[in-house]
Amino acid sequence: MKKKVFTVAVSLLTILLLVACGNNKKSTDTSSSEIPKTSSSQKAEQSSKTIEFSTTAIDTVIYEGKGVTLTYKGLEKDDYEYTLKLAYKNTSNKEYEVQTRNGKVNNISNNDNHKIIICSDTLKASATSEGSIKLPINALEAASITKPKVLECNLEVIYDITETVAKIPIKVTFE
């Protein structure tokens, strides 16, 4: 008798625990003909054409949208690197990252053997800031590039690590 009471009590307790851990959300009708919207992480705003400019074209607006403006401010060169200076204006209430992807200099791709393009800047919410795209001279030399002539890459504006907000293809001619 005690065994049966114990088994029934454990069974009831198990059922109560399963009900308590169940999904509290209302179910959705999957037979609806409505097509779900694509999230912005899957569909970033992409410039339809490549933004082309030379290193002498100071104050070139590269991108303007989603509360963010990216502007090219000039080229600096020292013994260690070429630096393409950028200015950022973020009028949104979100913090973004700007990074380069699929980059190449003089048609030589950026890869693990030679990191010829470096860019990772943070844009604080409702702020202006400065950043840069750097081309380290030792990495350029390792890739057999004596002088950069053309930089091609995508500048990507990223929110919350995974959501690409904008993808801007650029082509910069060094003069």
Q: Each PLM stretch: what is its role?
A:
Residues 1-9:
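Bacterial N-terminal signal peptides that target proteins for export
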